[in-house]
Amino acid sequence: MAKLEITLKRSVIGRPEDQRVTVRTLGLKKTNQTVVHEDNAAIRGMINKVSHLVSVKEQ
C-alpha cells in the first residue's frame, strides 16, 4: 500500500475546532511539520477536510 507524506502548511490559529482536531489527529502540531501515513480511506477523508491547510505527496 502507498504511503502519503502530509505537511502542515498553514496555521490552525483561528480555525474551527473540528479542523484543529483533524490536524492533531493526523499527528501534526507545528507548521511545516511532516508525517507519513498509509494511504487509506480514513486518512484521505481527514486530508480532504483540511486540504486548505496541508500539502500531500505520495511516496
From Swiss-Prot:
Pfam families reported in the protein's UniProt record: Ribosomal_L30
Molecular function in Gene Ontology: structural constituent of ribosome
InterPro entries listed in its UniProt record: Ribo_uL30_ferredoxin-like_sf (IPR036919), Ribosomal_uL30_bac-type (IPR005996), Ribosomal_uL30_CS (IPR018038), Ribosomal_uL30_ferredoxin-like (IPR016082)
Record's GO cellular component terms: cytosolic large ribosomal subunit
Coiled coil: none
Record key words, sorted: Ribonucleoprotein, Ribosomal protein
Matches recorded under Gene3D superfamilies: Ribosomal protein L30, ferredoxin-like fold domain
Gene Ontology process terms (BP): translation
Subunit structure: Part of the 50S ribosomal subunit.
Family: Belongs to the universal ribosomal protein uL30 family.
Protein name per UniProt: Large ribosomal subunit protein uL30
Organism for this UniProt entry: Bacillus subtilis (strain 168)
Gene that encodes the chain: rpmD
